[in-house]
Amino acid sequence: MAFIALGINHKTASVAVRERVAFTPEQMVEALQQLCRLTTSREAAILSTCNRSELYLEIDHPTADDVLAWLADYHRLTLDELRACAYVHQDEDAVRHMMRVASGLDSMVLGEPQILGQMKSAYAVAREAGTVGPLLGRLFQATFSTAKTVRTDTAIGENPVSVAFAAVSLAKQIFSDLHRSQALLIGAGETITLVARHLFEQGVKRIVVANRTLERASLLAEQFGAHAVLLSEIPEELANSDIVISSTASQLPILGKGAVERALKQRKHKPMFMVDIAVPRDIEPEVGELDDVYLYSVDDLHEVVAENLKSRQGAAQAAEELVGSGVAEFMQRLRELAAVDVLRAYRQQAERLRDEELGKAQRQLANGADPAEVMAQLARGLTNKLLHAPSVQMKKMSAEGRIDALALAQELFALDEGAPRH
């Protein structure tokens, strides 16, 4: 038995490669079942996000070559392409990796809270697929428990430093009371979703989501009581927008200086806070030259992120120590589980011997034998049978000079005297 954690992430693979190794939600159940059917994986779960694709496995041997081959084949990569950017962690290292990931210690943004929810979703999907059993299930539960401890006992989750958090925190600096502010969000991807959530939690007066497709904008808007519009309707919304945050995949700017200038006139030059998170940029840089416009780029936000990260290094160290404790505790429990089957078999053997001797005693009593003698014979017989196999093995070990095994037997039976002598 071995635990394996393997995959690629933002540190080992480019976006182009990560896109090729990503699993869509629609693929997940079938992929998990195929993984367990075609490889030596007995239990499996898959975590697939924009920054990582990882497989968590309970496998019957300590290598994962067949799993890497399956992953490459599934996504139509060559094995060499995958090996060039993949990592494989085994047993204690695999446990540590999972706990670090769930705690946000392996994330692009240190301590980001979304990853724990994503890992819980991966576990839920694996359960739905029927590919999680008792061992991997215990590891996930221990991982969630450790991540929760990290969140509650350290400051790793305080003053979040994701780009979305940074954008909203800057907005709070510009507008002291967000309850009176209206926001226009351009795009409907993961980052804009996070921005929408943070603005909603801050009680922003009104949120408008603009996207290339109205369906996608509506799906996001429904989550936060927002209003959905098409990109073509942005000029009509600009004049009412105190906050504009954009993150799309457009190759050309969506907002130009002229459109913003016209909106400012309608606003009577009331300040407008704008954040362009997109690469390439959604908002023409010249917009920042306008009075009453506070325009920030993704690079500006990264400076905020980097500054906040410095203050969280102490929290990160404390989190690493908690992860270490979580790993040690889980590995100890895992080792204890290894004794369960042996203890169960030993108990069954003892109960069988007990039943044999008890049946013999009951027959003797039925035939009128002296109860005291029957009890004595029962005790002697049970003692002899229970000691027979261990006695034979200890004599054999002694003859072979296995003093260490005899010392272990003494510890096993909690004997105070009769220690083996060299």
UniProtKB/Swiss-Prot annotation:
Q: Which domain of life is it from?
A: Bacteria
Pathway given for this chain reads:
Porphyrin-containing compound metabolism; protoporphyrin-IX biosynthesis; 5-aminolevulinate from L-glutamyl-tRNA(Glu): step 1/2
Which Pfam families does the record cross-reference, listed alphabetically? GlutR_dimer, GlutR_N, Shikimate_DH
Locate the residues binding substrate.
T49, C50, N51, R52, S107, E112, P113, Q114, Q118
Show which residues form the site (Important for activity). Answer: H97
Instruction: Please give a single GO biological process term from the UniProt record.
Output: protoporphyrinogen IX biosynthetic process from glutamate
Please give the Gene Ontology molecular function terms for this protein.
glutamyl-tRNA reductase activity; NADP binding
Give, as one word, the top-level EC class.
oxidoreductase
Which InterPro entries does this entry report, sorted A to Z?
Answer: 4pyrrol_synth_GluRdtase (IPR000343), 4pyrrol_synth_GluRdtase_dimer (IPR015896), 4pyrrol_synth_GluRdtase_N (IPR015895), GluRdtase_CS (IPR018214), GluRdtase_dimer_dom_sf (IPR036453), GluRdtase_N_sf (IPR036343), NAD(P)-bd_dom_sf (IPR036291), Shikm_DH/Glu-tRNA_Rdtase (IPR006151)
User: For binding NADP(+), which residues are annotated in this chain's numbering?
Assistant: G187, A188, G189, E190, T191, I192
Active-site residues per Swiss-Prot or TrEMBL entry: C50
Keyword terms, alphabetized: NADP, Oxidoreductase, Porphyrin biosynthesis
Which reaction is this enzyme known to catalyze?
A: (S)-4-amino-5-oxopentanoate + tRNA(Glu) + NADP(+) = L-glutamyl-tRNA(Glu) + NADPH + H(+)
Q: What is its EC number?
A: 1.2.1.70
Q: Which family does it belong to?
A: Belongs to the glutamyl-tRNA reductase family.
Record's function text:
Catalyzes the NADPH-dependent reduction of glutamyl-tRNA(Glu) to glutamate 1-semialdehyde (GSA).
Q: What is known of its domains?
A: Possesses an unusual extended V-shaped dimeric structure with each monomer consisting of three distinct domains arranged along a curved 'spinal' alpha-helix. The N-terminal catalytic domain specifically recognizes the glutamate moiety of the substrate. The second domain is the NADPH-binding domain, and the third C-terminal domain is responsible for dimerization.
Question: Can you state the subunit structure given in the record?
Answer: Homodimer.
Misc: During catalysis, the active site Cys acts as a nucleophile attacking the alpha-carbonyl group of tRNA-bound glutamate with the formation of a thioester intermediate between enzyme and glutamate, and the concomitant release of tRNA(Glu). The thioester intermediate is finally reduced by direct hydride transfer from NADPH, to form the product GSA.
**Name of the featured protein:** Glutamyl-tRNA reductase
The organism's lineage is: Bacteria, Pseudomonadati, Pseudomonadota, Gammaproteobacteria, Pseudomonadales
